[in-house]
């Protein structure tokens, strides 16, 4: 019997290995809203969290309970009270909050404990720890409204949490915390997750919401946002009256976390099976990241980038789209190359060859990874090469191309005669290849 070859599985595993190594030993804070816990996909999310733990990732899981609390209040005919979009937790509400949060804690602990069942790791034990790692204090009175048992964080015992993580446990935190006087307070899961990520110096904070991420005007997922961009999104939603959706709540925390040193915050959907794994173990992820520094950088190439450039351009050379370059030639000309790199993978490149006497430059060896050709990476490279040419005192830019004629024409290049090429370039023109010459004024 011939076994079926799973090519996609092999390729996926190969691509995920660098991320497995990168994430091992790092601390991630995962925020699960009550909506995520209610969803039918929650069992899969818990299994994926168990998988992350088995890969050596240090995990703090923070759960919320808004819908469960509201359901408990409704069942007991107790009207919920809010002031400035914050729940007012009176004594009766507090008892119902503690019931809902306690039930969820036991349920999540049980699910995490058995998350590796029916997997090759069955039998491996996951230790889930909860405790009084957070000390709370009351919100107090605002505009004459007493928030009663609604609270905020006073301090976090990060050393105790680190000891639990060092021992291999998953730390589970709910929305109820106690004060130094022994009173219980209702906190928001967003504040808990955000402050934990900051205090623990977490590598990532991950939030599960109903949407896959932040979308643009065309409905496409925005893969990255800087904190100021995320803040603008929050303010735009608040102007529409959206103060408490999962996305808005998470973005508020993500902005604060990133500005306080958390490298990346990820917004993904609890409705998408495997979203957590796709986000963490693929180059482009599946949701939206809030980052202080982009995972994608455009910069001048160095000698260490030659391998990545060769891997990118070889298929195009084999198809006859690019002129073949040897490693030795690349080594000599590497200072002329600009690359776009994403998570240490070269996804686009281009070179600028100046002809100072004629005040003209050639943009050559333009290549974009197949996964990114529908995006704007080519335009980004063109803008950067044009800027470099202008800084070098050049007034025109030309390209030789056999396949991308229309692309360059749409961006201001016009076909010209070979005679307009610099003399030294004209002498090297390959008449068998019959490349078209297009030129643009740099202005």
Swiss-Prot record:
Example of a GO cellular component annotation carried by this entry: cytoplasm
Keywords from the UniProt entry: Acyltransferase, Amino-acid biosynthesis, Arginine biosynthesis, Cytoplasm, Transferase
Record GO terms (molecular function): glutamate N-acetyltransferase activity; L-glutamate N-acetyltransferase activity
Activity regulation info: Feedback inhibition by L-arginine.
Top-rank EC class of the record's enzyme: transferase
Predominant localisation class: cytoplasm
Residues of the N-acetyltransferase domain: 296-443
Compartments in which it is found: Cytoplasm
GO biological process: L-arginine biosynthetic process
Pathway: Amino-acid biosynthesis; L-arginine biosynthesis; N(2)-acetyl-L-ornithine from L-glutamate: step 1/4
One Pfam family it belongs to: Acetyltransf_1
InterPro entries xrefs: AceGlu_kinase-like_sf, Acyl_CoA_acyltransferase, Asp/Glu/Uridylate_kinase, GNAT_dom, NAGS_kin, NH2A_AcTrfase
Coiled-coil regions listed in the entry: none
EC number: 2.3.1.1
Catalyses which reaction(s): L-glutamate + acetyl-CoA = N-acetyl-L-glutamate + CoA + H(+)
Alphabetical list of PROSITE patterns matching this protein: GNAT (PS51186)
Miscellaneous comment as given in the Swiss-Prot or TrEMBL entry: The mutant strains shown below are all feedback-resistant (fbr) strains exhibiting enhanced arginine biosynthesis.
Subunit (UniProt): Homohexamer.
Family per similarity comment: Belongs to the acetyltransferase family. ArgA subfamily.
Protein known as: Amino-acid acetyltransferase
Record lineage: Bacteria, Pseudomonadati, Pseudomonadota, Gammaproteobacteria, Enterobacterales
Name of the gene encoding the protein in the UniProt record: argA
């Amino acid at each position: 019997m011939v076994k079926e070859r799973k090519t996609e599985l092999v390729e996926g595993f190969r691509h995920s290995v660098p991320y497995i190594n990168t994430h091992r030993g790092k601390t991630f804070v995962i925020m699960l809203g009550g909506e995520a816990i209610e969803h039918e996909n929650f069992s899969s999310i818990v299994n994926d969290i168990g998988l992350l733990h088995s890969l050596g990732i240090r995990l703090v899981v923070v759960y919320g309970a808004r819908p469960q609390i509201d359901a408990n209040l409704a069942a007991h005919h107790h009207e919920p009270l809010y002031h400035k979009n914050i729940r007012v937790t009176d004594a009766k509400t507090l008892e119902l909050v503690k019931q809902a949060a306690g039930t969820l804690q036991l349920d999540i602990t049980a699910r995490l404990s058995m998350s590796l069942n029916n997997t090759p790791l069955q039998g491996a034990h996951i230790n889930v720890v909860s405790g009084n790692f957070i000390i709370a204090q009351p919100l107090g009175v605002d505009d004459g409204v007493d928030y009663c048992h609604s609270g905020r964080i006073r301090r976090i015992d990060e050393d105790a949490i680190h000891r639990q993580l060092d021992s291999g446990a998953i730390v589970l935190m709910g929305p109820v915390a106690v004060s130094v006087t022994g009173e219980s307070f209702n906190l928001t899961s967003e504040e808990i997750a955000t402050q934990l990520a900051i205090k623990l110096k977490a590598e990532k904070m991950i939030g599960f919401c109903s949407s896959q991420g932040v979308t643009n005007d065309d409905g496409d997922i925005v893969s990255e946002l800087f904190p100021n961009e995320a803040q603008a999104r929050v303010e735009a939603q608040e102007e529409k009256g959206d103060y408490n959706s999962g996305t808005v709540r998470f973005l508020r925390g993500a902005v604060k976390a990133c500005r306080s040193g958390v490298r990346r915050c990820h917004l993904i959907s609890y409705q998408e099976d495997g979203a957590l794994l796709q986000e963490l173990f693929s180059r482009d992820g599946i949701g939206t990241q809030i980052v202080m520094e982009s995972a994608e950088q455009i910069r001048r190439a160095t000698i260490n980038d030659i391998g990545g450039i060769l891997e990118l351009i070889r298929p195009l050379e084999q198809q006859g789209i690019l002129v073949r370059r040897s490693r030795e030639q690349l080594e000599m000309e590497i200072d002329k190359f600009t690359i776009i790199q994403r998570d240490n993978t070269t996804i686009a490149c281009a070179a600028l060859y100046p002809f100072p006497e004629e005040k003209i430059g050639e943009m050559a060896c333009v290549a974009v990874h197949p996964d990114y050709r529908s995006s704007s990476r080519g335009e980004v490279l063109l803008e950067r090469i044009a800027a470099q040419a202008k800084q070098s005192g050049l007034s025109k830019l030309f390209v030789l191309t056999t396949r991308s004629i229309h692309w360059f024409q749409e961006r201001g290049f016009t076909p010209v005669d070979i005679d307009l090429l610099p003399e030294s370039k004209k002498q090297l023109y390959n008449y068998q290849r019959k490349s078209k010459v297009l030129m643009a004024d740099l202005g």
